[in-house]
């Protein structure tokens, strides 16, 4: 039985095709492309699981792509899941991606945790060994910082990326790229130090650039999608 997992984020959509519990295909779609040309292997999939923090337009495009799949599950944030308890008074306002990442992390590692997701935004969430969510932080990711400088500072317009060299730059480009990288790395290391006795679980496309292969961190490639499958498979099939 083939099942399609989708994680619709702020700037792109991550998908993977699972058969008998094994990932057999995966891909990433960057928004902006015509939804009719989105390439996902929907043919043969009997179920689809969706996590989305994106716009109504993206959600509508997903529904169109999945229209031939009978059983489609859309994840929602809850006040609790098993022994995991959401810290937000308005629990539904916690992004479903953060919630699913917490579910996956705590299911894999039921201990004191710091969960870091480096994407368009960098999110940090803490949970204790009893499953009590202690809240967290949200900060702009590197691409957002670079875009802000590009849009709001006329003299700095240009196309920039990450530069992991931490010595001071000797050109405007180097100063911007290294400065943004330094801010990102300092933020992540700072929140990690706050929970030095906890397991630090990291995910997201930007985490490798910031942390490399540091063994002090537990890297899980598909943390949100893993949490999505945990929740979806707990719901009876229609």
Swiss-Prot record:
E.C. number, please?
2.7.1.33
Q: Which InterPro entries match?
A: ATPase_NBD, Type_III_PanK
| Keyword annotations | ATP-binding, Coenzyme A biosynthesis, Cytoplasm, Kinase, Metal-binding, Nucleotide-binding, Potassium, Transferase
Residues involved in ATP binding: 7-14, 120
Superkingdom of this protein's organism = Bacteria
What does the record give under GO molecular function?
ATP binding; metal ion binding; pantothenate kinase activity
Cofactor(s) required, per the database record: NH4(+); K(+)
Pathway linked to the protein: Cofactor biosynthesis; coenzyme A biosynthesis; CoA from (R)-pantothenate: step 1/5
Where does the chain bind substrate? 88, 95-98, 172
Q: Keyword Nucleotide-binding on this protein?
A: yes
Pfam families on file:
Pan_kinase
Primary location class: cytoplasm
**NCBIfam families recorded:** baf (TIGR00671)
Similarity remark = Belongs to the type III pantothenate kinase family.
What role does this protein play? Catalyzes the phosphorylation of pantothenate (Pan), the first step in CoA biosynthesis.
* Assembly and binders: Homodimer.
Which HAMAP family does the entry link to? Pantothen_kinase_3 (MF_01274)
Q: What protein name does the entry list?
A: Type III pantothenate kinase
């Amino acid at each position: 039985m083939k099942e399609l997992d989708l994680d619709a984020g702020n700037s792109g959509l991550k998908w993977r095709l699972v058969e008998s519990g094994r990932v057999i295909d995966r891909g990433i779609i960057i928004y902006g492309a015509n939804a009719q040309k989105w390439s996902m292997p929907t043919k043969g999939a009997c179920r689809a699981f969706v996590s989305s923090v994106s716009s109504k337009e993206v959600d509508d495009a997903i529904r169109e792509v999945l229209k031939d799949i009978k059983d489609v599950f859309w994840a929602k944030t809850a006040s609790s899941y098993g022994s995991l308890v959401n810290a937000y008074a308005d629990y539904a306002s916690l992004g479903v991606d953060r919630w699913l990442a917490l579910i996956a992390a705590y299911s894999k590692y039921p201990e004191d945790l710091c969960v870091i997701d480096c994407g368009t935004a960098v999110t940090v969430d803490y949970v204790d060994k009893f499953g009590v969510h202690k809240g967290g932080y949200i900060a702009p990711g590197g691409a957002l910082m670079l875009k802000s400088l590009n849009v709001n500072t006329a003299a700095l317009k240009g196309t920039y990326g990450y530069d992991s060299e931490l010595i001071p730059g000797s050109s405007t480009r180097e100063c911007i790229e290294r400065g943004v990288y330094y801010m990102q790395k300092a933020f992540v290391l700072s929140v990690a130090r706050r929970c030095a006795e906890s397991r630090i679980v990291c995910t997201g496309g930007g985490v490798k650039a910031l942390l490399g292969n540091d063994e002090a961190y537990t890297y899980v490639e598909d943390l949100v999608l893993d949490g999505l499958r945990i929740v979806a498979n707990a719901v009876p099939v229609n």
